[in-house]
Amino acid sequence: MQERYQPNSVEAAAQQTWQARDAYLVHEHAKNPDGSEKPKFYACSMLPYPSGKLHMGHVRNYTINDMMARQLRMRGYNVLMPMGWDAFGMPAENAAIKSKVPPAKWTYDNIAYMKKQMKAMGLAIDWSREMCACDPKYYKWNQWLFLKMLEKGIAYRKTQVVNWDPVDQTVLANEQVIDGRGWRSGAPVEKREIPGYYLRITDYAEELLDQVSTNLPGWPERVRLMQENWIGKSEGLRFAFPHRIAGADGKLIQDGKLYVFTTRADTIMGVTFCAVAPEHPLATHAAQSNPALAAFVEQCKLGGTTEAEMATREKEGMPTGLTVTHPLTGAEIDVWVGNYVLMTYGDGAVMGVPAHDERDFAFARKYGLPIRQVVALEGKTYSTDAWQEWYGDKQAGRTVNSGKYDGLAYQAAVDTIAADLAAQGLGEKQTTWRLRDWGISRQRYWGTPIPIIHCADCGPVPVPEQDLPVVLPDDLIPDGSGNPLAKNEAFLSCSCPRCGKPARRETDTMDTFVDSSWYFMRYTSPDNDQAMVDARNDYWMPMDQYIGGIEHAVLHLLYARFWTKVMRDLSLLNFDEPFTKLLCQGMVLNHIYSRKTPQGGIEYFWPEEVDNVYDAKGAIVGAKLQRDGSEVNYGGVGTMSKSKNNGVDPQSLIDTLGADTARLFVMFASPPEQTLEWSDSGVEGANRFLRRLWALGYAQREAVGRGLATGADWAQAPAPVKELRREVYGLLKQADYDYQRIQYNTVVSACMKMLNAIDDAPLPEGPAADAARAETLGLLLRVLYPVVPHITWHLWQDLGYAEHLGDLLDAPWPHVDEAALVADEIELMLQVNGKLRGSIRVAAKAPKEDIERIAAAQEEVARFLEGRPPKRVIVVPGKLVNVVG
């Protein structure tokens, strides 16, 4: 055994052995030595995008997964920990444009490097199950399921107003529009009408919502709430404002009814205007004879179509000159075009009740529209001068200024008004959803080709199943001017499957969220080229533990749940939800340093480029550049980011201090679900602990060897040996509990205390001490192994544990020796007249009379009683003894 800890050689030796053994190859229905079947456990991290290099967020995510997998394997589970690559998407195209290489080459080069990094981390991944989204063997099944959805009517084609990114030249989902700009390009998003394919996720809205509360108890509450809010169930009233507005053909537009939906039917008597979306038929009709309105409509189309953007955008409108009729009062109501109204939500029109809706209130004040109060609260005075929160209260209010509906509470008003509108054929109660069907068409090259052929005679025709996959050409180099598939004749040209005439392939590709909606099931059946999944999927799924960032709380998780339900309804699987438990690990943070450039931009500096300036309390208040002493701004801590120069390269850390140091730091520094603040001193502390562990093993190697060979009779062991065993087994019990709670930082803390206890124990020489050293160090190595597998495996081998107990890879999780936790002696607090004056040690099973005698005989008692005899002695078993005198 080498004297000094050398992480590079230690880790290389361990990894070579594991690879030679196929140590992490997993099979279904694995058996115990007695022939019984092991329970399965499927633990999976969200698959990464192959961007080029791992970042510390990856290291944290995968180490959490790896700790879980290794510890559960020790507990006797058949554990699956797979890995794959979310390989399609725009970054590969953008990189290809920049480097003038095909996205495929860029992607596979990155995968090779990142896979090498993962192996260097020592992750217990079954690489035989590796999948890659850009592999035709994988995306064939995207296409196959899409065709099945077409057959069932779940997938369909329609033209709709969409978010268009003019730089990336593609449609964006609502969630991909951030503050009116594309999530990748940063370009202002436009509205366009484009045909595309959609999936009816709204058909599953009720089930998706209901099962959030009934089927996902193992998910964080905040994620469940985010899912519920995104699905967004609203119960209200859909009703019409009649009108006599005719189009150019002389027919009434939309049959003479302007429909709106409201959850506040109790305020209908307060409607003073209606607003329609810029794309609404009434807006189009009015704009034909109104150039100013036409210009306003075009201006509105420059923004995105997301609810979030609508909420923050300044509300603007223009009157159409059209009016509709209030269905209950017969009053004429002006129709406006509003830039905040979405054509894709409801009927593309809203009623305006300024008195009781904050948005409408601001709009009415801006344009001088009437404000009519129709709900009042006792003791409150209404004023149109400024909005007050109670104006929107629907629980405590009563209707006023509403004619026959005066004096009604919210539900009574809703029911009465709904009944009256229904009697006129102008309204009905309805449930609506915030959730919208999933548009999966993307005008990009690097994605799953949509398996459709366009024929001049037959229209869109599905590609026959036997012709799948429609293979994406992998040698194209995008130039930034639209979709290169649309220019590639070899891909485009084909024959119609129905009539045989020349036809053209669909050039849109699928949203990359399709790829990540079921990849975790392909891990279970990776080598089946005849079926999407097989019986092995029934064995592993649903997944026991999913691990990933909170940023995926809505989109990815919702789409994966939807995809699972579709596959269930196609009889491909027999469960409702894909993920039993979800852990959202916290972000990794680091210090941010910056200053403004002369051009008005922001320049960021690496933490190692600056010296911090501290205040009297030791807090960072600024920084100076090391190279010239100039001042830079300290921006606190934030998520590690390439753009802010505050990331830490895991590979550099692995190369210098080892993967075990990186793993130990990210597990010890913070609970898994909380943010982790990077600390160079913390990293050094982790490395120092590992050096201490190695030094302890080296110093005790001979004693451990003797102890493993001889063993001991613990009942006859000296008191220091019993005390060491009691302390270590107590820490083992705590670590065992914390492993089950996934509180890995306190697991590491327990291991550090174990090391201190073993290192500091004043053991006498002899067989019992040798056996105690061997036992307690062996316990520490096993508890610590899931955290730092390389050093613990190496020490296990070098110290002889493998020879006596088998390879650490296959070692069982240690059981707590309850007998060791029973103390021969216990310590009791000693009080004199109720005040703490010291402590005494007594036999654990000492009778009350002996404890009273020992306590009364203490020097402290005589001193504080000033020679007086005790009047009485009170014993609180196991805690204290109080001498009263």
From Swiss-Prot:
Residue positions binding ATP: 642
Gene Ontology cellular-component terms listed: cytosol
InterPro entries noted in UniProt: aa-tRNA-synth_I_CS, aa-tRNA-synth_Ia, Leu-tRNA-ligase, Leu_tRNA-synth_edit, M/V/L/I-tRNA-synth_anticd-bd, Methionyl/Leucyl_tRNA_Synth, Rossmann-like_a/b/a_fold, tRNAsynth_Ia_anticodon-bd
Motif ('KMSKS' region): 639-643
Organism: Bordetella parapertussis (strain 12822 / ATCC BAA-587 / NCTC 13253)
GO biological process: leucyl-tRNA aminoacylation
Gene Ontology terms for molecular function: aminoacyl-tRNA deacylase activity; ATP binding; leucine-tRNA ligase activity
Protein name, as recorded: Leucine--tRNA ligase
Entry EC number(s): 6.1.1.4
Subcellular localization: Cytoplasm
Family, per entry: Belongs to the class-I aminoacyl-tRNA synthetase family.
Reactions listed under catalytic activity: tRNA(Leu) + L-leucine + ATP = L-leucyl-tRNA(Leu) + AMP + diphosphate
Extent of motif 'HIGH' region: 48-58
UniProt keyword list: Aminoacyl-tRNA synthetase, ATP-binding, Cytoplasm, Ligase, Nucleotide-binding, Protein biosynthesis
PANTHER family: LEUCINE--TRNA LIGASE, MITOCHONDRIAL, LEUCYL-TRNA SYNTHETASE
